[in-house]
Amino acid sequence: MRVSEGENFKDLKRVVRGSRLHTVCEEARCPNIFDCWNRRTATFMILGDVCTRACRFCAVTSGRPAELDLGEPLRVAESVAELGLRHAVITSVDRDDLLDGGAGIFARTIRAIRQRSPGTTIEVLTPDFQGDFNAVRTVVEAGPDIFNHNTETVPRLYSRIRPKAVYANSLALLRHVKALAPSMVTKSGLMVGLGETEEELVEVFRNMRAHNIDVLTVGQYLRPSKKHAEVARFYRPEEFAALKVQALEMGFGHVEAGPLVRSSYHADEQVPARKSQLAG
């Protein structure tokens, strides 16, 4: 299938290249890149493009990261302003080599965007900061509209798929965000097709709601290469629809579920909808 590169896509690609920035859209080979970029939403990946972890589902390069680029927050903010983005998502590689896990750079990036593009909504998709709540506070106090941290898979599969992470820490992180900022939208995402059962997925949904998570995304895992975890099975569209119904019945304010759904999919639509619900 041939996908058309619209003018918005070309503009964003030009600015990203010219500003020496990274996007997770490209680094993680997201299937929705054309859709999102043409909607003027993008996910910038800060803290470099080399991750200190090597999760078995992720296409991002792992290894020893370079030194911090202290000019990165300003370049991201200038790019957001130049492109007139409606919604900017800021994510990062894991930086377990840094004392604050990169939280300070997240905060500087958020504030720089706010200063130059006050009408742009901002979502952060953070690592787990190794359970450091001080790092979480640093990001929350910068005031993003959405705080996203992905649970990724069910706890039984963590040792195989996400060996350096702890399921309970991911949930606790998002609960702490809500404790610090009750009106901030919290969000998490799951991949399916890694060998989980429906019962395990539903239990994760329950755990998320018990930790006051507002928005859920559920998408099909696609194997980036032969060195990554194999796909156990592909879910049918009606299975995603059923999972969405169950999640909404549990009280999630917004759910995106489908084969190509990723954590930032249609993220620009989630901020006003959920904020109005929380305000009401």
Regions found by a protein language model. Give the residues of each.
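Auxiliary Fe-S-binding modules of radical SAM enzymes
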Residues: 1-43, 74, 78, 108-119, ...
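Small/polar loops that bind or transfer phosphate-bearing groups
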Residues: 46-47, 124, 257
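Canonical Radical SAM [4Fe-4S] cluster-binding loop centered on the CxxxCxxC motif
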Residues: 35-72
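Conserved functional loop/turn residues at catalytic and ligand-binding sites
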Residues: 50, 54, 59, 84, ...
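Nucleotide phosphate-binding site architecture
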Residues: 31, 52, 155
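Glycine/Thr-rich phosphate-binding loops of Rossmann-like dinucleotide-binding domains
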Residues: 54, 98, 157, 226, ...
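Core AdoMet radical
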Residues: 59-76, 80-133, 139-173, 187, ...
